């Protein structure tokens, strides 16, 4: 049984024959990125670097970000979100599996009308957490103040991107709120449920999907 990253045949433009390359390298060339783990510094630098590079290479063609993540660090998630708002191409965010905590924050960062959830995906939002309980009292107070600022900032973004009133989002974030794809669409976290898109494009060219998949 093969171990490691799968390899697939890929013909580099200009070459006569295809060569076997890592699957993810092929996907990157097709402007398709994956957030499939906890959001930490390494994966954040990886994704943001690719977004910037792809934007420099082609500032028009869309980028596709598939998300299946339990969430992770606040600052790392905000870094991905801010990069998505900065690069020039539109970014599709596509949730498959789960987008929880900061992963749901990344999900709503996609271009409006281009945020998608697969039919059986689960989306969860809640308030930011911290390990402040380990700190001494002065540090505790400073961290609580900073956490409050971050929470307010994140709540404002959710409210802006979903169209919900600030107070509604703030109350919902007091607890873990899990949603189905349809519930997430009704809430404003995503714009389209995946099966709706399949129905819409079943008799037409799937322009919403990466070029490499159109002949599959």
From Swiss-Prot:
Function: Cleaves peptides in various proteins in a process that requires ATP hydrolysis. Has a chymotrypsin-like activity. Plays a major role in the degradation of misfolded proteins.
Major place of residence: plastid
Keywords: Chloroplast, Hydrolase, Plastid, Protease, Serine protease
Signal peptide residue numbers: none
Name the record gives this protein: ATP-dependent Clp protease proteolytic subunit
GO CC annotation: chloroplast stroma
Biological process (GO), any one: proteolysis
Gene name tied to this protein: clpP
Top enzyme class: hydrolase
UniProt cross-references to Gene3D superfamilies, sorted A to Z: 2-enoyl-CoA Hydratase, Chain A, domain 1
EC number: 3.4.21.92
GO terms assigned for molecular function: ATP-dependent peptidase activity; serine-type endopeptidase activity
Oligomer and partners: Component of the chloroplastic Clp protease core complex.
CDD domains: S14_ClpP_2 (cd07017)
InterPro entries named in the record: ClpP, ClpP/crotonase-like_dom_sf, ClpP/TepA, ClpP_His_AS, ClpP_Ser_AS
Entry keyword Transcription regulation: no
Superkingdom field: Eukaryota
Family: Belongs to the peptidase S14 family.
Subcellular location: Plastid, Chloroplast stroma
Active-site residues, as the UniProt record annotates them: 101 (nucleophile), 126
Entry-linked PANTHER family: ATP-DEPENDENT CLP PROTEASE PROTEOLYTIC SUBUNIT
Reactions catalysed according to its record: Hydrolysis of proteins to small peptides in the presence of ATP and magnesium. alpha-casein is the usual test substrate. In the absence of ATP, only oligopeptides shorter than five residues are hydrolyzed (such as succinyl-Leu-Tyr-|-NHMec, and Leu-Tyr-Leu-|-Tyr-Trp, in which cleavage of the -Tyr-|-Leu- and -Tyr-|-Trp bonds also occurs)
């Amino acid at each position: 049984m093969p171990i490691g990253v799968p390899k697939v045949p890929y013909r580099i433009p200009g070459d006569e024959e295809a060569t076997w390359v890592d699957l993810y390298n092929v996907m990157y060339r097709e402007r398709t990125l994956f957030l499939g783990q906890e959001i930490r510094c390494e994966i954040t630098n990886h994704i943001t670097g690719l977004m910037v590079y792809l934007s420099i290479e082609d500032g028009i063609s869309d980028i596709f970000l598939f998300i299946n993540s339990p969430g992770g660090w606040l600052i790392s998630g905000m870094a991905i979100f801010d990069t998505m708002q900065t690069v020039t191409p539109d970014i599709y965010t596509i949730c498959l599996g789960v987008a929880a905590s900061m992963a749901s924050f990344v999900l709503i960062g996609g271009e409006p009308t281009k945020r998608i959830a697969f039919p059986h995906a689960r989306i969860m939002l809640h308030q930011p957490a911290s390990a402040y309980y380990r700190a001494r009292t002065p540090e505790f107070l400073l961290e609580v103040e900073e956490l409050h600022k971050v929470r307010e900032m994140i709540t404002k973004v959710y409210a802006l991107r979903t169209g919900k009133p600030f107070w509604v989002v703030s109350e919902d974030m007091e607890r873990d709120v899990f949603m189905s794809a349809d519930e997430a669409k009704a809430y404003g976290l995503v714009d389209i449920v995946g099966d709706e898109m399949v129905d819409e494009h079943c008799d037409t060219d799937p322009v919403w999907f990466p070029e490499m998949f159109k002949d599959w």
